From Swiss-Prot:
Comp. bias (Polar residues): 489-502
Entries under Pfam families matching the protein: Roc
UniProt xrefs under PROSITE patterns: RAB
One GO CC term, this protein: cytosol
UniProt-annotated stretches for the region Disordered: 281-729
Family: Belongs to the small GTPase superfamily. Rab family.
Domain of life, source organism: Eukaryota
Pro residues compositional bias, start-end: 331-351, 606-615
Organism: Homo sapiens (Human)
The protein, known as: Rab-like protein 6
């Protein structure tokens, strides 16, 4: 506001100021103001001198570009103005000041009233700005001497004043009134002779003579070019001053160098001492810094319960589970019974895949996962630890057990059914790298099983032996947990029924342990997945307990919805045509079921907990791509044949396992006989269809091998037939 007002006021007052400018003064042209605002490199002063009525003021106006005025108005005081001029095409901005000098000014006193009498003393008392008042040659770069060629006394003024001009100032003698040449009195030769004969010391500046006519602007170009001489002389003087300054600076620098040579800075011994002192000073802070980062790095690893271990575990898969074993159980114990504390320690070994799933699970069901987040990261750690590449990844027995343990209570079954689709989608996207959820569950189950049943697991690398050991271990783990969590047992029982007959007991035991942790939303889907797949794999073995398993899973209203859906999907070859919801759940469960079974079978032969032998990518790829039943039959027979080879040696063990599985299924069926009847019929039909679809030898091999692989987690072929059979159906 104020700036705008000032501008308005200034614009209003501008004309008044112009009016108040005294004689001999004027405001600078706007164009010149803009030009000089950028900066002025040179200030050049040109003085116009001459007798009265010789055309000084006319020349002064002409240099400004103003028109010629016929009327003669004597100038009372010195006038100064700036003109546009530049040296040829250079970018140097030169401010040229032209002075219209008055030798004797006549200043008239302006009174308020009428002048009544003449007072000579009063007139003399007043002074005007003229040549007598100041030295016009001070800082002058050029002089223009003017005379009237028709008047001799004007030339006498030149003869009198020219010698007074400083010798270093160039002078241009200009004979004006050339348009009145017929009346001329002074010839050009007379002027040149005078200039040439003028006594000037050597090195004096230049004198030039020219004629002009202000009426028709004749001679202005010559005068304009004459200004180059004062400019070049000014430039040379400026450069000389710069050279002098340069020389002075050079001398000063030489003096400084001579002094510097004698100072301590040039003493090499002192310099070395200073360098040593500096190095010591830097070394101490560096050491402190080096120590500080190590504690900093350690601190993040120690405080991080599950997530931190997940990040650190991939580098060191085995040591990571030990840390979570100590830290995870206390964290999980308050929200969940002690049975649940055991699975979390196993989980920490699978960090990377578990981490991504944890974030997804948190987004899907934060309420239910409030307690499970710590256990989830822990199981995820083991999977990645063993998996160095997609092809090398092989789920261990941990997957099946983890699925069973992760079974949530009946109340969470509905949520699990909805979440199963999301988890399946995640597992599908991650099929190549390995299903993080499946790997996490496998790790959890294996870790728990290893400490409790570690002696029986190493009993034999054979898949059948591993299966029996894993089932016994799971049964042991389940025993303490069954008491605290009866509801989860119901969920686990249908799951175990779906699974192979021998695996029913271990899943029951592990299921309660996981059920103790209701927060696992995807636990039910994962468990049910492996169980369903196992049931589909061993149709021959499932026959004895088929009726019991089906009845319990289908008739059990309290059982997890996801588990029921899985049972239908696994049993029905036409399940895809059924409800869209059932299809989604079935797809989710088979995908996870396959990884869980595969991990159990794979880990069994190599080492029960960590070393998976068979590559997971093939298994998951089949599940993801073969959800519609494409090419699963081929994978199934190949794997079944492989299992048959492996199962030939432990055929006795397989039979024993089958008997044990049948007994376990019968026990579970007795507990839930009402629910089992309904599912027995459906499962019997589905198993018949599977038998028809499967080749006879593959049925026998797959039935026995899959049971052994599922229980021991080592049979490589079991995982393929499990997922393949379901997909074929």
């Amino acid at each position: 506001m104020f700036s705008a007002l000032k501008k308005l006021v200034g614009s209003d007052q501008a004309p008044g100021r112009d009016k108040n400018i005294p004689a001999g003064l004027q405001s600078m042209n706007q164009a010149l103001q803009r030009r000089f605002a950028k900066g002025v490199q040179y200030n050049m002063k040109i003085v116009i001198r001459g007798d009265r009525n010789t055309g000084k003021t006319a020349l002064w106006h002409r240099l400004q570009g103003r028109p010629f005025v016929e009327e003669y108005i004597p100038t009372q005081e010195i006038q100064v103005t700036s003109i546009h001029w530049s040296y040829k095409t250079t970018d140097d901005i030169v401010k040229v000041e032209v002075w219209d000098v008055v030798d004797k000014g006549k200043c008239k006193k302006r009174g308020d009233g009428l002048k009544m009498e003449n007072d000579p003393q009063e007139a003399e008392s007043e002074m005007a700005l003229d040549a007598e008042f100041l030295d016009v040659y001070k800082n002058c770069n050029g002089v223009v001497m003017m005379f009237d060629i028709t008047k001799q006394w004007t030339f006498n003024y030149i003869l009198r004043e020219l010698p007074k001009v400083p010798t270093h100032v160039p002078v241009c003698v200009l004979g004006n009134y050339r348009d009145m040449g017929e009346h001329r009195v002074i010839l050009p030769d007379d002027v040149r002779d005078f200039i040439d004969n003028l006594d000037r010391p050597p090195g004096s500046s230049y004198f030039r003579y020219a004629e002009s006519s202000m009426k028709n602007s004749f001679g202005l170009k010559y005068l304009h070019k004459f200004f180059n001489i004062p400019f070049l002389q000014l430039q040379r003087e400026t450069l000389l001053r710069q050279l002098e300054t340069n020389q002075l600076d050079m001398d000063a620098t030489l003096e400084e160098l001579s002094v510097q040579q004698e100072t301590e800075d040039q003493n090499y011994g002192i310099f070395l001492e200073m360098m040593e002192a500096r190095s010591r000073g830097h070394a101490s802070p560096l050491a402190a810094n080096g120590q500080s980062p190590s504690p900093g790095s350690q601190s993040p690893v120690v405080p991080a319960g599950a997530v931190s271990t997940g990040s650190s575990s991939p580098g060191t898969p085995q040591p990571a589970p030990q840390l979570p074993l100590n830290a995870a159980p206390p964290s999980s114990v308050p929200p969940v019974p002690p049975s649940e504390a055991l699975p979390p320690p196993a989980c920490p070994s699978a960090p990377a895949p578990r981490r991504s799933i944890i974030s997804r699970l948190f987004g899907t069901s934060p309420a239910t996962e409030a307690a499970p987040p710590p256990p989830e990261p822990v199981p995820a750690a083991e999977g990645p630890a063993t998996v160095q590449s997609v092809e090398d990844f092989v789920p261990d027995d941990r997957l099946d057990r983890s699925f069973l343990e992760d079974t949530t209570p009946a109340r969470d079954e509905k949520k699990v059914g909805a979440k199963a689709a999301q988890q399946d989608s995640d597992s599908d996207g991650e099929a190549l790298g390995g299903n993080p959820m499946v790997a996490g569950f496998q790790d959890d189950v294996d870790l728990e099983d290893q400490p409790r049943g570690s002696p029986p697991l190493p009993a034999g690398p054979v898949p059948s032996q591993d299966i029996t050991l894993s089932s016994e271990e799971e049964a042991e783990v389940a025993a303490p947990t069954k008491g605290p969590a009866p509801a989860p047992q119901q969920c686990s029982e249908p799951e175990t029924k779906w699974s192979s007959i021998p695996a029913s007991k271990p899943r029951r035991g592990t299921a309660p342990t996981r059920t103790a942790a209701p927060p696992w939303p995807g636990g039910v889907s994962v468990r049910t997945g492996p169980e369903k797949r196992s049931s589909t794999r061993p149709p021959a073995e499932m026959e004895p307990g088929k009726g019991e398993q089906a009845s319990s899973s289908e008739s059990d209203p309290e059982g997890p919805i996801a588990a029921q859906m899985l049972s239908f999907v696994m049993d029905d070859p036409d399940f895809e045509s059924e409800g869209s919801d059932t299809q989604r759940r079935a797809d989710d469960f088979p995908v996870r079921d396959d990884p869980s079974d595969v991990t159990d079978e794979d880990e069994g032969p190599a080492e029960p907990p960590p070393p998976p032998k068979l590559p997971l990518p093939a298994f998951r790829l089949k599940n993801d791509s073969d959800l519609f039943g494409l090419g699963l039959e081929e994978a199934g027979p190949k794997e079944s044949s492989e299992e048959g080879k492996e199962g030939k040696t432990p055929s006795k063990e397989k039979k024993k396992k089958k008997k044990k599985g049948k007994e376990e299924e019968e026990k579970a069926a007795k507990k839930k006989s009402k629910h089992k009847k309904s599912k027995d019929k459906e499962e019997g039909k589905e198993e018949r269809r599977r038998r028809q679809q499967r080749p006879p030898r593959s049925r026998e091999r797959t039935a026995a091998d899959e049971l052994e692989a599922f229980l021991g987690g080592g049979a490589p072929g079991g995982r393929h037939p499990g997922g393949g059979d379901y997909e074929e159906l």
